[in-house]
Amino acid sequence: MYPSNPRTLDSFWPCRGQPSLPYAPYRPPNWVTRWLTPGEQARYEADCAAGKPNRYGPDDIEYRFNSQGFRCVEFDEIPKDSFVVLSLGDSNAEGYGLPVEHTWPHLLCEKLRPLVASEVCNLNLGLSASSNQHIAIRASRAMQSPELHPNVVFIDWSYSHRILYAYEDGEIMDWPFPTDSDMKSKDPKIKLKRLYYEQLQSEKFDLCNLMANIMLVEAVANLHRIRICHSFIHQSTEKQDWLSRRVDGIVGSRTDVRNARDLVHLGLEHNEWISDLMRDWFKTAGISAKGKAS
């Protein structure tokens, strides 16, 4: 059930006996829109006015969210006996500025269809601006949910500097690096975020925090005998090297044109590449048609 106050600490961490299905606190349930934010539309219109080429028009993308705020099917409509592919990440997984057909979770599922005997169900739990803590929480809840029963999990870990924070008033928020407007803001909450990045955040803490989140989801996955494909594509080369010596994951980098509709997010070509890497991992992971490690 989607909580009435989704961004509060009390709702985010339900009491015993309450539903613990993952939900997207930054997306209204059952929302259908052509623009995720006013900023997305304003940027698009400014780019068009400046004559910048764009493969998408204003009506080419529809964001359609389920009752838990995710860009996928309703959880109670997962086809029986289907092969459930759970995908998680930030805006690159959710598909900011992209039609759903161009997101990497959708492309991946299309590439997995010839490799499994049953129908493939795409559960995309990507959420823009997610910290890795938030991704790990969603992944763990999904793997423990009998309603979702994923067969395999693909996690495209987010930028490691992001962190999930709870304010004293109980509001929760994923913090990315401060924007230019954040640096000028006098809002006490924004000033607190700025203070964290100016005085506390460090590369070593980011790496330690990411590794702790990886261990969390691996523990849950091992308990339920589910294989996880970790993608470290968004980490620096140094972090990829450190992580790959400790975790079986996808590494690599390439320069892709940021050609989503906002001309900021990565587009179809990047998602074809990462979904190819994930498909290749799946081929060698020893996963049966029922999703358990063989």
Please name every model-derived segment.
Residues 256-294:
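Histidine-centered active-site loop/cap adjacent to the catalytic His
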Residues 1-86, 148-151, 156-204, 218, ...:
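N-terminal secretory targeting modules
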